[in-house]
Curated annotation (Swiss-Prot):
This is Phosphoribosylformylglycinamidine cyclo-ligase. It catalyses: 2-formamido-N(1)-(5-O-phospho-beta-D-ribosyl)acetamidine + ATP = 5-amino-1-(5-phospho-beta-D-ribosyl)imidazole + ADP + phosphate + H(+). It comes from the Bacteria. Belongs to the AIR synthase family. CDD domains: PurM.
Length: 345
């Protein structure tokens, strides 16, 4: 008698588990839906009807990103419900830097063995991030990839689309000598520099993730999994209140490289390092890893998550607007001509 042939499930891909996960995430996705969304989960594509009455000449702004090796910390700790917030933050904060209001988001989850409970936790985090950003989670993909990832390993990618009036598109071109730099604090490492952080703190120093660290006031794992801040509400309010010349999301490359990306030719900036409240986790990495200060500023955000460039005329108004939104803005520097680079002093 012939033996029965192999099934897809025996090969490592469980379609029934995938269907269960879809049912489990529907409640989280549903919480994010804006009126412009025309489709539900299960379609081949997500439908979003742009409200053209809000714009004279709309420009769509898109961005994609991941969470990087911060996911390794989440997987080591078995904590999966916050990295989805990181995923949304990394994408929406980028498109926000051009003045765009985030409209919708899509996620991609690649996993070794599909666990519906784990997928639900990941999507729960994504939905929480979307709620913070005011955008809809309108689609996604979960790929079970046995033999490519270990059973409990996964990776995340996200895609955000927003819109801005063409005349209000921000690209840094109007930045001028003497403009001021206002910074918004980060919550910690956000989602960058984790390869160096793990090398120093886990491998070199031998600290356990569950170990409480006096300098931090909690465990190392809690610090490393603190979600990336989403700056959308504060920045959108600021854009309505005053003229903003440039916005920089401080991610990989730190303050120097990300701020330089928006500077016109012939202009640079001077950052006052004394104005920056460097968070304890960065001091810990610098000390235990004997990492040079310049390398720290080139790798990590050092406590600054977003930088806003405004004319001195709007300085006071910008600070008030940001404080009214619950932010703690600080003046950290100014734009200067004939520098061609950003320097930290």
């Amino acid at each position: 008698m012939d033996k029965p042939g192999l099934s897809y499930k025996e090969a490592g891909v469980d379609i029934d588990a995938a269907n269960r996960s879809v049912e489990m995430i529907k409640k989280w996705v549903g919480q994010t839906i804006r009126p412009e969304v025309l489709s539900g989960i299960g379609s081949f594509g997500g439908f979003f009807a742009l409200d053209l009455q809000k714009y004279q000449e709309p420009v769509l702004v898109s961005g994609t990103d991941g969470v990087g090796t911060k996911l390794r910390i989440a997987q080591m700790m078995g904590v999966h419900d916050s990295v989805g917030i990181d995923l949304v933050a990394m994408c929406v904060n980028d498109i926000l830097a051009h003045g765009a209001e985030p409209l919708f988001f899509l996620d991609y989850i690649a996993i070794g063995k599909l666990d519906p409970v784990l997928v639900e936790l990941l999507v729960k985090g994504v939905s929480q991030g979307c709620l913070q950003a005011g955008c809809s989670l309108i689609g996604g993909e979960t790929a079970e990839m046995p033999g490519f990832y270990r059973e409990k390993e996964y990776d995340l990618a996200g895609f955000a689309v927003g819109a801005v009036e063409r005349s209000r598109l921000i690209n840094g071109s109007s930045i001028a000598d003497g403009d001021l730099l206002i910074a918004l604090p980060s919550s910690g490492l956000h989602s960058n520099g984790y390869s160096l952080a793990r090398k120093v703190l886990l491998e070199k120093a031998g600290i356990k993730l569950e170990e409480n660290i006096a300098e931090l006031g909690h465990s190392l794992g809690e610090e490393l999994l603190c979600p990336t801040r989403i700056y959308v509400p504060a920045i959108l309010a600021l854009l309505e209140a005053c003229e903003v010349k440039g916005l920089a999301h401080i991610t990989g490359g730190g303050i120097v490289e990300n701020l330089q990306r928006i500077m016109p030719s012939g202009l640079g900036a001077v950052i006052d390092s004394q104005a920056i409240e460097i968070k304890p986790v960065f001091k810990l990495i610098e000390k235990l890893g004997q990492v040079d200060k310049s390398e720290m500023f080139r790798t990590f955000n050092m406590g600054i998550g977003y930088i806003i460039v405004v004319s001195p005329l709007y300085h006071d108004k910008a600070l008030k607007c940001l404080r009214d939104k619950g932010e703690k803005p600080i003046l950290i520097g100014r734009v200067e001509k004939d520098r061609e680079k950003v320097s930290i002093q």
